[in-house]
Design a protein with these regions (language model features):
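Regulatory nucleotide-sensing modules
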Residues: 1-44, 50-59
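A cross-family signal for key residues in well-ordered alpha-helices
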Residues: 4-7, 107, 111
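Cyclic-nucleotide recognition modules
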Residues: 47-106, 110
């Protein structure tokens, strides 16, 4: 039930060509989750690929600060994205859902830091 509410406000994407998701130093308007495919991350003059099954823009979303990296979805990436303002509203109205969703984001962050 609760997860359906989050998916209801999500937009599905299926990229046909590289698509910018976040730009370092700017506050992202969307949070992304890559289900299949990859994204190219550029940070501190380094580039690397992440995905599938990763969030993009989660740190900026959690701490309400600009993105720490520029990220492009590669062609053929599939997933969902949420407008951050809509997601924030939904989670503010559903505290238990917010705890669970923030837990997913934190788990994703921890796994990235461990690599």
């Amino acid at each position: 039930g609760e997860f359906k509410k989050i998916l209801k406000i999500a937009d599905w994407f299926d990229t046909q060509s590289a698509e910018q998701t976040t730009t370092e130093g700017e506050i992202p308007e969307r949070l992304y989750f890559i289900i299949d495919g990859e994204a190219l991350v550029a940070r501190d003059n380094k580039e690397f690929f992440v995905g599938p099954n990763v969030f993009i823009g989660e740190l900026a979303y959690l701490i309400k600060k600009p993105a720490t990296a520029s990220v492009k979805l590669t062609d053929k990436a599939v997933g969902v994205s949420w407008k951050t303002s809509n997601l924030t509203k939904l989670l503010a109205a559903n505290p238990q859902m917010k705890i669970a969703f923030d837990g997913l984001l934190n788990q994703d962050l921890a796994s990235k830091l461990a690599k």
